[in-house]
Curated annotation (Swiss-Prot):
Task of the protein: Involved in DNA repair and RecF pathway recombination.
Single GO BP term: DNA recombination
GO cellular-component term (any): bacterial nucleoid
UniProt cross-references to SUPFAM superfamilies, sorted A to Z: ArfGap/RecO-like zinc finger
InterPro entries: ARFGAP/RecO, DNA_rep/recomb_RecO_N, NA-bd_OB-fold, RecO, RecO_C
This protein's UniProt keywords: DNA damage, DNA recombination, DNA repair
Keyword Plastid appears in the UniProt entry: no
DNA damage in keyword set: yes
Protein encoded by which gene: recO
Pfam families: RecO_C (PF02565), RecO_N (PF11967)
Record organism: Rickettsia canadensis (strain McKiel)
Domain of life: Bacteria
Family in the record: Belongs to the RecO family.
The protein's name: DNA repair protein RecO
C-alpha cells in the first residue's frame, strides 16, 4: 500500500551507512515512519528535522515500517540555526510532537496550526505563541485547559489560579483558601496586550509542564529538548514578548 501526503520531518535515526529511519508528521495520516536512503549531500539535506516535504510511504502491509521517499518543499534550517531562542523553541516543539502524538492518527487541524507556527517562528520568536502551541498540543491530546472563566463561580474577571485536577481556572477569591494546592494562571494568557515578565514565563511553563507530566509523559519519559528550552528561557533575560 502507498500513502502520499505533505508532512514535517520530526525525527531521523541512522540505521546503517547512508540509511535512516525518518518519522514524518503528515497532514492527513499523522505520524508515519519509513526507511530512506540518503547518499548524496543534497539528499541528506532533504531529510533534516523540521523540513516540510512531499512524503511518499510504501509498504506491502500497513503494519510494516515501509520505505519512504521525500521531496523538499521548504527548509527552516537557515531561519533557526543562527538564533538560539528560535532554535531552542523549534527543537522543543518538534520533540513534543514526536513524543506525544500517536502513530498513524490523523491531526489535520493541528498540522495546519504547526505550519502556521513554524512560519511565524521563522520571522520572530514570541513566548506567547510558544505557550499557545503547548496549550494547543494539550488540547489535541485530550487535556484542554479551560482558562476562560472560574470553574466555581463562572465569573470571567480576577482569574488567578488553575486547578491541577480539572485544568480549569479559578478566581482569586475562590482559590485563595487552597492556594498551596493550585497552579498560578499567568496574566498574559488573559490579555493579548500585556507584557510578559520572567516570572510569568516561569508560571506558564510550570502550568503546561504539570499537565504534560501528569497525563502525557509516562515512566519518567520527557522531551529533553523541551527541558533545554525551559532552562534557556528561564535563565536568560529576554524582551517581554
Amino acid at each position: 500500500m502507498n500513502i502520499k501526503d505533505i508532512g514535517v520531518i520530526v525525527a531521523k535515526k541512522p540505521l546503517k551507512e547512508n540509511t535512516f529511519i525518518i518519522t514524518v508528521f503528515t497532514k492527513n495520516y499523522g505520524l508515519y515512519s519509513g526507511v530512506v536512503k540518503a547518499s548524496s549531500k543534497k539528499s541528506k539535506f532533504i531529510y533534516q528535522e523540521g523540513n516540510i516535504v512531499d512524503f511518499l510511504w510504501m509498504a506491502r502491509l500497513h503494519e510494516h515500517i515501509g520505505i519512504a521517499k521525500c521531496e523538499l518543499i521548504k527548509s527552516y534550517t537557515g531561519y533557526f540555526i543562527t538564533n538560539k531562542t528560535k532554535l531552542y523553541a523549534f527543537n522543543s516543539i518538534i520533540s513534543l510532537i514526536k513524543e506525544l502524538l500517536h502513530e498513524r492518527e490523523e491531526y489535520s487541524n493541528f498540522f495546519s496550526f504547526l505550519i502556521n507556527y513554524l512560519d511565524n517562528l521563522s520571522k520572530k520568536f514570541f513566548f506567547r505563541d510558544y505557550i499557545n502551541f503547548e496549550l494547543a498540543l494539550l488540547d489535541i491530546a485530550g487535556y484542554k485547559l479551560d482558562l476562560s472563566k472560574c470553574a466555581v463561580s463562572n465569573v470571567k474577571q480576577d482569574l488567578y489560579y488553575v486547578s491541577p485536577k480539572s485544568g480549569r481556572a479559578l478566581s482569586y477569591e475562590v482559590g485563595k483558601p487552597y492556594k498551596d494546592k493550585l497552579l498560578i494562571l499567568p496574566k498574559f494568557l488573559l490579555s493579548d496586550n500585556s507584557k510578559i515578565t520572567l516570572e510569568e514565563k516561569r508560571q506558564a511553563l510550570t502550568l503546561t509542564n504539570y499537565f504534560f507530566n501528569r497525563y502525557l509523559f509516562h515512566n519518567n519519559r520527557h522531551a529533553e529538548a523541551r527541558q533545554a528550552f525551559m532552562e534557556y528561557i528561564l535563565h536568560r533575560c529576554h524582551p517581554a514578548t
